[in-house]
A protein has these predicted regions:
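Active-site phosphate/pyrophosphate- and oxyanion-stabilizing loops and adjacent acidic/basic residues
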Residues: 22, 59, 109
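Rossmann-like NAD(P)-binding element
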Residues: 1-32, 36-45
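Short beta->alpha connector loops
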Residues: 13-16, 76-78, 100-102
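Active-site-lining helix/loop region of Rossmann-like oxidoreductase modules
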Residues: 92-156
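Conserved catalytic-site region of short-chain dehydrogenase/reductase
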Residues: 42, 77-81
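Short beta-strand and adjoining strand-loop segment in the mid-core
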Residues: 46-54, 59, 84-102
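Rossmann-fold dehydrogenase core element
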Residues: 53-76
């Protein structure tokens, strides 16, 4: 549970993001919070990015959880691959954003525990909107190519 964990991952639909975080403010105080939420809309043309008033879901989390160490990560992972028992390795880089080095280092280390996965520091929370928004493009790629595409950062 959130109260007993050092690192808490938030992976909920955008529509319930703010309400959930506000209700857990006390339980999440002092914890590293990893926001994985992608503010997306969907219509007949497909997925598209929404722009939260705070700038991103992660920035909204930081505003709602002033006593937590908010990071943003794990946005581009395929739930299908993560749940597939036959998959031994997830070939993906996890972009990790945050304000505090120790918190982003901890989240990178968490990503590195999954075979094939690599945590990569990708900047501060003010850049989380771009990372969250890219999921709309990945959804289009995955639909077109019947894939579970992710990202790799090269030359690091």
């Amino acid at each position: 549970t959130a109260a007993t964990s050092d690192i808490v991952i938030v992976a909920v639909p955008w529509e319930g993001h703010a309400e959930l975080l506000a209700s857990l403010r006390t339980e999440l105080a002092g914890k590293i919070v990893v926001d994985c939420v992608n503010p997306l809309g969907f219509d007949k043309q497909g997925a598209y990015a929404l722009k939260p008033e705070e700038g991103s879901a992660a920035q909204q989390a930081a505003a709602l959880l002033p006593d937590s160490r908010v990071t943003a990560a794990f946005h581009h992972l395929s739930a299908v691959l993560l749940l597939d028992q036959a998959v031994d390795e997830v070939d993906i880089d996890v972009l990790v954003l945050g304000e505090e080095r120790a918190a982003t280092d901890a989240v990178q280390a968490l990503a590195n525990r999954v075979p094939g996965m690599r945590g990569v520091f990708a900047g501060r929370l003010r850049n989380a909107h771009q990372v969250e928004s890219l999921v709309a493009n990945l959804i289009s790629v995955n639909r077109r190519y019947k894939a579970h595409a992710g990202l790799r950062v090269t030359d690091i």
